[in-house]
Amino acid sequence: MSIYKIPLPLNILEAARERITWTLNTLPRVCVSFSGGKDSGLMLHLTAELARQMGKKICVLFIDWEAQFSCTINYVQSLRELYTDVIEEFYWVALPLTTQNSLSQYQPEWQCWEPDVEWVRQPPQDAITDPDFFCFYQPGMTFEQFVREFAEWFSQKRPAAMMIGIRADESYNRFVAIASLNKQRFADDKPWTTAAPGGHSWYIYPIYDWKVADIWTWYANHQSLCNPLYNLMYQAGVPLRHMRICEPFGPEQRQGLWLYHVIEPDRWAAMCARVSGVKSGGIYAGHDNHFYGHRKILKPEHLDWQEYALLLLNSMPEKTAEHYRNKIAIYLHWYQKKGIEVPQTQQGDIGAKDIPSWRRICKVLLNNDYWCRALSFSPTKSKNYQRYNERIKGKRQEWGILCNND
């Protein structure tokens, strides 16, 4: 896909319908990934309506994060009932999945539906709660792992589509996920498709070129069901760019934590008891607050950024600090091998693009970015984590980087 925008001879709604129609006609199995948000909701509306006209069946995947608004759960159930005639299988997944908890250094990861703890709410009776339902499922696997494995499992070794409602203008990472020149396409004239791991499924992005104004214009014109939580967010003064519906404790998502306190006080109380750091996150994680180093980061005047990073590491719980030391050591060694010394700061070093500096490392630590995504890391598989940790700890001694906690 070109990094330059090339105008199409049709509008975005016509283009989206054309892409969905092609998907339904070309691939025998189609699954819509649905979060309960405005984008995936619009995609589900379009896909289900076209499937109904064409006499086709679709499947839907919904990951239930346990700590979610009642509005969202009710909305998901409403769409499930609205399109029951075209939905062959609705995978309402309520299994333990691991994701970041960017609110606490004592519990930097959390599992939804974790066994033997008191949950924020109970899953629906027909939700998938049996770990043996999916042959690929491993207890505590990450959301990213689950979705990759699900795509291959769903294909049944035949061509299949996983429809994903992300938009390229939402973030740099989402733009790259679609536009990267390294992605394999179904065909050269299908730049809105990418190959899923496993070789049988294809990720389809039918609304990749929509803007947020286009989304709301469509809902206004068509009067289709939308998550009522957005109305509550609007009334609470939340800017459009911060209206997110997903798991609530990630680096970006935590900015909306305070809404639980306002909209659902009972659920808020359960979340505070369930997940470490939620109460402080509700106070300090707002989009205008610098507590977590979200936008602007400051350091003590008598320290440089490298010294500040070491101070932050030494102030953390030891287990969490060792995790970060291992990641940072790999990061520094990678540049060391290229003959590049990571500077204290450089222009653009705390933006979306990974421009190396000690200030960027400080931002990762302040942001509680446990998986170090801002340093271009992906989550380590939980079953390999302990062995990986010990191996990198030994490598640090060999490299002479961040050994002896200095």
UniProtKB/Swiss-Prot annotation:
Domain of life the protein comes from: Bacteria
Molecular function, one GO term: catalytic activity
Record-annotated membrane-spanning stretches: none
CDD domains the UniProt entry points to: PAPS_reductase-like_YbdN
GO biological process, one term: cellular response to oxygen levels
The protein's name in its UniProt record: Uncharacterized protein YbdN
Highest classification ranks of the organism: Bacteria, Pseudomonadati, Pseudomonadota, Gammaproteobacteria, Enterobacterales
A Pfam family annotated for this UniProt entry: DUF3440
